Amino acid sequence: MLSKAHAKINLSLDVIGKRKDGYHLLKMLMQTIDLYDLIEIKKIKKDIIIDCDREYIPKDRRNLAYKAATLFLDRYNIDSGVRINITKNIPVAAGLAGGSTDAATVLKIMRDIFEPDISNEELKEIALDIGADVPFCIEGGTALCEGIGEKITPIKNFKNHILVLVKPNFGLSTKDVYNNLKVEKIYIHPNTTKLIQSIEEDNLKSVARNMRNVLENVTLRKYKALNSIKSNFIELGALGSMMSGSGPSVFGLFDDMLKAQICYDNMREKYKEVFITRTI
């Protein structure tokens, strides 16, 4: 069984506190985009086997797809195994939920193969044990995600808007970015209410004005290339530009495909991983 595993971007990301166990409390608007990995799963007699077209992708318990399969088989006492083939298109360590969406897609395919009556809500319970972005990736679309990612409120879908996406030639550790964030020194927070209103009105310019990611407080200081990419996007006609998640991917939001194509061509001269895509 074959399925697409779609990436996500953040239209906003706010950190509003920190729990005693070290987890940060988040308030973020998440958006599915039409950039995806392909996941194919076949039922086998035993074990979990991961195949991938990229050598650098782990094929053991470090892979979230492996973890998803393990949790599913254990939870439902399934006495068989799966072979999972991953065709990677989403950049890794990029703030695009590449591993999380693969894990979510594994859960959905395994439901179809083994336990078709399981609800999405039940899948989200398993998903939260894998990672904070995985529950959102079960359904995707446009949603307000709160807590550590487990509180998901769907909003009007902000679909079919043009993006150019740049993944610089380095990765970032989500853990390191959050560890270097000083919550008490976040002085400007996203206006999430205004952003949701702009999305519901499909007001692209207002969405662009209200996009904000507080993790840029950490990354823009350390990685000057991210400032340069954001500036280049605006110079090349983007309505707004922001880092997605914990980075380092940066996207520009466009209202014109010709401008987006010119921007894409320009960015391709500097960066290897550049994509034109849309919100879905």
Curated annotation (Swiss-Prot):
Its EC number is 2.7.1.148. It comes from the Bacteria. Pathway: Isoprenoid biosynthesis; isopentenyl diphosphate biosynthesis via DXP pathway; isopentenyl diphosphate from 1-deoxy-D-xylulose 5-phosphate: step 3/6. GO terms for molecular function: 4-(cytidine 5'-diphospho)-2-C-methyl-D-erythritol kinase activity; ATP binding. It is an enzyme of class 2 (transferase). GO terms for biological process: isopentenyl diphosphate biosynthetic process, methylerythritol 4-phosphate pathway; terpenoid biosynthetic process. The active site is at K8, D133. ATP binds at P91, V92, A93, A94, G95, L96, A97, G98, G99, S100, T101. SUPFAM superfamilies: GHMP Kinase, C-terminal domain, Ribosomal protein S5 domain 2-like. Keywords: ATP-binding, Isoprene biosynthesis, Kinase, Nucleotide-binding, Transferase. It catalyses: 4-CDP-2-C-methyl-D-erythritol + ATP = 4-CDP-2-C-methyl-D-erythritol 2-phosphate + ADP + H(+). Catalyzes the phosphorylation of the position 2 hydroxy group of 4-diphosphocytidyl-2C-methyl-D-erythritol. HAMAP family: IspE. Belongs to the GHMP kinase family. IspE subfamily. PANTHER family: 4-DIPHOSPHOCYTIDYL-2-C-METHYL-D-ERYTHRITOL KINASE, CHLOROPLASTIC. This is 4-diphosphocytidyl-2-C-methyl-D-erythritol kinase. The lineage of its organism: Bacteria, Bacillati, Bacillota, Clostridia, Eubacteriales.
